[in-house]
């Protein structure tokens, strides 16, 4: 499994097939990506300039809302993940 560094988190976005009203299945690159995902890995936290460590505010298993254009898609072991900084997370969904 990937282990994020610094203040990064790794998200797993569920891939859903989208069908138009006319029954046409849209290719994944033609669909707008959702801005919600599940946290699958969290770093140990970021280190401040004075050396103090700030623990992450999310944990593995949390469902989160994130900025639409945040992060980098990474393919690993046949799966696509999104790696982003914790500051790009907007909310945890209960």
UniProtKB/Swiss-Prot annotation:
PANTHER family: 10 KDA HEAT SHOCK PROTEIN (PTHR10772), CO-CHAPERONIN GROES (PTHR10772:SF58). This is Co-chaperonin GroES. Coiled coil: none annotated. Pfam families: Cpn10 (PF00166). One of its GO terms (molecular function) is metal ion binding. One of its GO terms (biological process) is chaperone cofactor-dependent protein refolding. SMART domains: Cpn10 (SM00883). Its main location: cytoplasm. It is found in: Cytoplasm. Disulfide bonds: none annotated. The gene is groES.
């Amino acid at each position: 499994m990937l282990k994020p560094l610094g203040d990064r988190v790794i998200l797993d976005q569920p891939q859903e097939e989208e069908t138009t009203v006319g029954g046409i299945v849209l290719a994944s690159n033609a669909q707008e990506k959702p801005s919600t995902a599940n946290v699958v890995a969290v770093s140990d936290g970021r280190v401040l300039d004075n050396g103090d460590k700030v623990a992450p505010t999310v944990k593995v298993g949390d469902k989160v809302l994130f900025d639409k254009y945040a992060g980098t898609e990474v393919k690993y072991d046949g799966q696509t993940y999104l790696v982003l900084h914790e500051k790009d997370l907007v909310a945890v969904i209960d």
